[in-house]
């Protein structure tokens, strides 16, 4: 029986490149140590990823009756989301395009083997 629990945050307003830096730090850690690491990180992505990790932990507890001490982060994936395209006025009547990127963050927690 598969005891993995998943949580997904779609359309997070942070670039995937910045979110992947934080995701790489917590990949493979136990659930409790991952939340502690994210709590004290100063990056914006840490706050967003912490919410998703806590949601995945809550899903594991409620849906499968798992204990938080036995959980670890099996996979954490940051995919590209929708891009908002904006234009900024430049000199001599020109304009340049600004791309505001978003991310889809997926966290899967499961029992530590």
From Swiss-Prot:
Quaternary state and interactors: Part of the 50S ribosomal subunit.
- Report which superkingdom the organism of origin falls in: Bacteria
- A GO cellular component annotation in the UniProt record: cytosolic large ribosomal subunit
Function statement: This protein binds specifically to 23S rRNA; its binding is stimulated by other ribosomal proteins, e.g. L4, L17, and L20. It is important during the early stages of 50S assembly. It makes multiple contacts with different domains of the 23S rRNA in the assembled 50S subunit and ribosome. The globular domain of the protein is located near the polypeptide exit tunnel on the outside of the subunit, while an extended beta-hairpin is found that lines the wall of the exit tunnel in the center of the 70S ribosome.
Q: Which GO terms describe its molecular function?
A: rRNA binding; structural constituent of ribosome
Family to which this protein belongs: Belongs to the universal ribosomal protein uL22 family.
Identification of the protein by name: Large ribosomal subunit protein uL22
Q: Per the UniProt entry, what are the Gene Ontology biological process annotations, in alphabetical order?
A: translation
The taxonomy runs: Bacteria, Pseudomonadati, Pseudomonadota, Gammaproteobacteria, Lysobacterales
List the Pfam families hit by this protein, alphabetically: Ribosomal_L22
- What is the organism of origin for this protein? Xylella fastidiosa (strain M12)
Keywords tagged on the record = Ribonucleoprotein, Ribosomal protein, RNA-binding, rRNA-binding
Which InterPro entries does the entry mention? Ribosomal_uL22 (IPR001063), Ribosomal_uL22_bac/chlpt-type (IPR005727), Ribosomal_uL22_bac/org-type (IPR047867), Ribosomal_uL22_CS (IPR018260), Ribosomal_uL22_sf (IPR036394)
């Amino acid at each position: 029986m598969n005891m993995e629990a998943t949580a997904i945050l779609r359309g997070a307003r942070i670039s995937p490149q910045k979110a992947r830096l934080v995701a790489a730090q917590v990949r493979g850690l136990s659930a409790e140590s991952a939340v502690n690491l994210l709590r004290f990180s100063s990056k914006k992505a840490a706050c967003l990823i912490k919410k998703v990790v806590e949601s995945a932990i809550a899903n594991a507890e409620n849906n499968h009756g798992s204990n938080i001490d036995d959980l670890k982060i099996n996979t954490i994936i940051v995919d590209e989301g929708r891009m908002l395209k904006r234009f900024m006025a430049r000199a001599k009547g020109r304009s340049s395009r600004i791309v505001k990127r978003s991310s889809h963050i997926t966290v899967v927690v499961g029992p530590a083997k």
